[in-house]
Amino acid sequence: MNKTILVTGGAGYIGSHTAFELQERGYRVVILDNLSTGHRWAIRADEFIEGDIRDTALLTQIFERIPVDAVVHFAAKSVVSESVLNPLDYYDNNVVGAQRLIQAAIFAGVTKFIFSSTAAVYGAANAEVIREDVDKSPINPYGHSKRMVELMLADAFKANQLNLSLIHI
């Protein structure tokens, strides 16, 4: 049986390309996306669920119905200027949404989680190439929200002895 990967934000640019590549490699792909910025035409999945990562009841239904082996989490608001004007929207969507997703995944026994973070967690780095060991000091609500999720994931996954990968795109 093929392993099942839940891709959040799978109707967006990076998420849709990732979903396609996962399918090409034989994984069963389930996309969860609210289509707030993604596109229905970009979806390539074995199953598409239109919904929001903040919807706890929906997440519970998904994890009860589908045997998810791993989560690849792209779903997020990501416009820096908008995050400055509406910071609480970014914390609600990016941080609260991630917390609900992480909690549901752990409760369902998912042991692998990949999180798409951002180079914005490094702030105004003074280097052309930013190394992973550079101090993280975001300078806007978008970067702060992604950094908060990184910290939350590290704590949650250490406590539960699970596998976590962070990608700074």
What spans do the regions from the language model cover?
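N-terminal Rossmann-like NAD(P)+-binding domain of SDR-like oxidoreductases, especially those catalyzing
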Residues: M1-L166
